């Protein structure tokens, strides 16, 4: 029996374009954590989709609900996306049929890799072909490697593709490298390695009212604590709200001129928008880092600088393509 109580020896039912098993279907499964779902992951996802279509079965991406280092090393790893965003990107960009998040806990950490393959991937999820990256490791003490997995799969009559590393500008594409770019404020280079504009999603919350009264009206969202924070400063951005996309100027930081806030805020002035955004979901796409956050002698000086920021953002965004994940 699997974890849901379904018999693993259920009878087979043949569908039009896929082989179904009562209780579960056969799948082509991509394995990995997929933080950022970047250009390296893209090669893996495209191969997964291609194989699934060829074999006439659903495609699946199997990942974890948290970064394994949270359990293995007991450290917090700032991520590029939330779990919901990872699912959305995988489905929208690569048309993967299903995305599952396995719970990574101490039981998972200590599970031998062979048992994980046999019990979870083959028996529970019906894997008939697996796709992994060249550096994929899993199972107790990371003893499972891509090469060991491929050998075991061959002995079970299951396919296993190993995707080689992907390089751009002589640099291996990796989540770690992209996190460093975002932390440094290099939004443009991060977009090259992600394959889309880095974004932050959140609900608009009330600010202190200073911007709307003395400066420019802004929509404020809290910086998600689980995600890597872009470098403090001002960015040319685009903001998605209620299905519409607006050019914007966004400040990330603590607003030192008008009194520092205890938490990091993401404040966006939407160009050409008027109305109340409180309670609405905003998605802020980062296009270009314009300048560092700085403390001005007074609000008048700050307002003059924001006007300059708006002009610079408009000049850059006028020739920029629309965001990819909307």
Model-derived segments and spans:
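A structural preference for short, hydrophobic beta-strand core positions in alpha/beta folds
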Residues: 61, 101, 162-163
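N-terminal Rossmann-like or analogous alpha/beta NTP/dinucleotide-binding catalytic cores
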Residues: 68-156
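N-terminal catalytic cores of NTP/NDP-binding nucleotidyl/phosphoryl-transfer enzymes
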Residues: 20-82
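Residue-level signal for inorganic ion chemistry
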Residues: 38, 90, 130, 190, ...
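Positively charged, low-complexity intrinsically disordered leader regions
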Residues: 1-31
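Glycine-rich, Lys/Arg-enriched anion-binding loops that position phosphate/diphosphate groups
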Residues: 153-253
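Generic structural signal for residues in well-ordered beta-strands
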Residues: 10-12, 99, 160
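Phosphate/ribose-recognition catalytic cores of enzymes acting on nucleotide-derived substrates
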Residues: 3, 207-326
């Amino acid at each position: 029996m699997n974890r849901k109580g379904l018999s693993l020896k259920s009878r087979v039912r043949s569908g039009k374009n896929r082989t179904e098993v009562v209780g579960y279907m056969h799948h082509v499964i991509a394995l990995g954590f997929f933080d950022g779902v970047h250009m390296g992951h893209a090669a893996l996802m495209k191969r997964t989709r291609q194989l699934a279509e060829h074999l006439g079965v659903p495609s699946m991406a199997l990942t974890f609900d948290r970064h394994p280092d949270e359990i293995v090393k007991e450290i917090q790893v700032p991520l590029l996306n939330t779990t919901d965003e990872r699912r959305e990107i995988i489905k929208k960009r690569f048309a993967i049929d299903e995305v599952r998040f396995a719970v990574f806990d101490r039981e998972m950490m200590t599970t031998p890799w062979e048992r994980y393959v046999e019990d979870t991937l083959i028996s529970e999820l019906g894997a008939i072909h697996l796709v992994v990256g060249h550096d994929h490791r899993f199972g107790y003490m990371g003893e499972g490697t891509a090469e060991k997995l491929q050998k075991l799969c061959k002995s079970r009559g299951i396919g296993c593709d190993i995707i080689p590393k992907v390089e751009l500008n002589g640099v291996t594409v990796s989540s770690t490298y992209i996190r460093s770019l975002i932390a440094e404020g290099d939004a443009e280079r991060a977009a090259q390695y992600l394959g889309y504009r880095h974004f932050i999603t959140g609900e608009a919350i009330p600010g202190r009212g200073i911007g709307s009264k003395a400066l420019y009206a802004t929509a404020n969202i809290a910086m998600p604590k689980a995600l890597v924070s872009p470098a403090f400063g001002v960015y040319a951005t685009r903001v998605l709200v209620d299905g519409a996309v607006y050019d914007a100027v966004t400040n990330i930081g603590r607003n030192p001129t008008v009194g520092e806030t205890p938490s990091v805020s993401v404040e966006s002035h939407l160009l050409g928008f008027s109305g109340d955004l409180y309670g609405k979901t905003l998605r802020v796409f980062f296009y270009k880092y314009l300048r560092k956050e700085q403390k001005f002698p007074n609000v008048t000086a700050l307002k003059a600088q924001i006007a300059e920021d708006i002009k610079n953002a408009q000049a850059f965004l006028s020739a920029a393509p629309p965001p990819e994940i909307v």
